[in-house]
UniProtKB/Swiss-Prot annotation:
EC number: 4.2.3.4
Alphabetical list of InterPro entries matching this protein: Dehydroquinate_synthase (IPR050071), DHQ_synth_AroB (IPR016037), DHQ_synth_fam (IPR030963), DHQS/DOIS_N (IPR030960), DHQS_C (IPR056179)
Cofactor: Co(2+); Zn(2+); NAD(+)
Protein's GO biological process: amino acid biosynthetic process; aromatic amino acid family biosynthetic process; chorismate biosynthetic process
PANTHER family assigned to the protein according to its UniProt record, in alphabetical order: 3-DEHYDROQUINATE SYNTHASE, 3-DEHYDROQUINATE SYNTHASE, CHLOROPLASTIC
Superkingdom of the source species: Bacteria
Binding site for Zn(2+): E184, H247, H264
Note on cofactor: Binds 1 divalent metal cation per subunit. Can use either Co(2+) or Zn(2+).
Protein name: 3-dehydroquinate synthase
Family, as annotated: Belongs to the sugar phosphate cyclases superfamily. Dehydroquinate synthase family.
């Protein structure tokens, strides 16, 4: 097992990475102070890992209940969030009840948001079971739900007590979900660590094959980078925005097609292709680096062409973005691997990028 720490003073927490961790009670025990635990999971993950988690928690002598949500990005909304509150209130959960998010990014984001809101804040633990949630969404305290007009527009910054990332859970992950997670790994290397990006290029096939050593290294390094960024800028005042490379275009794709048509990581992968193209058009990035970025995204079996939503529709969707100010779209663009720039772009350049990267 590897442990990475997120250094946030008195709200610091560990990220435990390894195989078989869901069944290890000693990883959960230090973070459960009250007499009850509510597991929040979904219809896909509960049959796979719910019993193992409940068995791990049993020796702790806590009252354990489970809320099972429908699976998919389309359910990341108020109605599903209320199912969590319904379960907590029915079970008479109190302020010391610990929520445990067992699932991917949707489960983690909604459980964290429920924890932030219920009785004005109860503790929660992240147990991410997808590659994307292990390398990205479970770390950093971003929680929330989607709105029909924009992704993740309703939420809170609320840190977990711990992240327990069991890479053994990745063996049951569908291929599309695995590729979606590799997209966030590529993003992390591209924005923050040129050497890690080199490693990803050399090992993308190993990641596609689910090689345990490659997955463990990718999760560890991605978490180290995200932890350092979050520690420096927890509430996305500046530096943390670089983690949204590929997300401005990507969120527009997700909202434009309807949540769940493309996986989040698929949209981010394509969004990175689009952001790379725009980076070259604005004279920030060299063409050879853009081609390297496109090649590794394609090698991860991610889409490299976006849907033809229309120029005006893309702009409208990108203006409904947490980085936008007074309706001005802000893009995270590459100068070189490991070096980014947050900037606006002329509409003409954006339209040229859309013409080149959509179909």
């Amino acid at each position: 097992m590897i442990t990475v720490n997120v250094d946030l003073g008195d709200r610091a927490y560990p990220i435990h990475i390894g195989a078989g961790l869901i069944g290890r009670a000693e990883l959960f025990a230090p973070h459960i102070k009250g007499s009850s635990v509510t597991i929040v999971t979904n219809t896909t993950v509960d049959p796979l890992y719910g019993d193992a988690l409940r068995a791990a928690l049993a020796p702790l002598g806590k009252r354990v209940s489970t809320v099972v949500l429908p699976d998919g990005e389309a359910y990341k909304n108020w109605e599903t969030l209320n199912l969590i509150f319904d379960g907590l209130l029915t079970d008479r959960a109190d302020r010391k009840t610990t929520l445990v998010a067992l699932g991917g990014g949707v489960v983690g984001d909604m459980t964290g948001f429920a924890a932030a809101c219920y009785m004005r804040g109860v503790p929660f633990i992240q147990v991410p079971t997808t590659l994307l949630s292990q390398v990205d969404s479970s770390v950093g305290g971003k929680t929330g739900i989607n709105h029909p007009l924009g992704k993740n527009m309703i939420g809170a910054f609320y840190q977990p007590q711990a992240v327990i990332a069991d890479i053994g859970a990745l063996t049951t992950l569908p291929d599309r979900e695995l590729a979606a997670g590799v997209a966030e790994i590529i993003k992390t290397g591209a924005i923050a660590d040129a050497e890690f990006f080199d490693w990803i290029e050399a090992n993308v096939d190993a990641l596609n094959r689910r090689d345990p050593a490659a997955l463990a290294h990718a999760v560890k390094r991605s978490c180290e980078i995200k932890a350092s960024v979050v520690a420096a800028d927890e509430r996305e005042g500046g530096l943390r925005a670089i983690l949204n490379f590929g997300h401005t275009f990507g969120h527009a794709i997700e909202a434009g097609l309807g949540y769940g048509e493309w996986l989040h990581g698929e949209a981010v992968g394509c969004g990175m292709v689009m952001a790379g193209d725009l980076s070259v058009r604005l004279g920030l990035l060299d063409e050879a680096s853009r081609q390297r970025l496109d090649a590794v995204i394609a090698a991860a079996h991610l889409p490299t062409r976006g849907p033809a939503l229309g120029d005006a529709r893309y702009l409208d969707l990108m203006r409904v973005d947490k980085k936008a100010e007074a309706g001005a779209i802000k893009f995270i663009l590459l100068k070189r691997f490991g070096d980014t720039l947050i900037t606006q772009a002329p509409d003409e350049a954006v339209f040229a990028t859309l013409a080149q990267t959509t179909h």
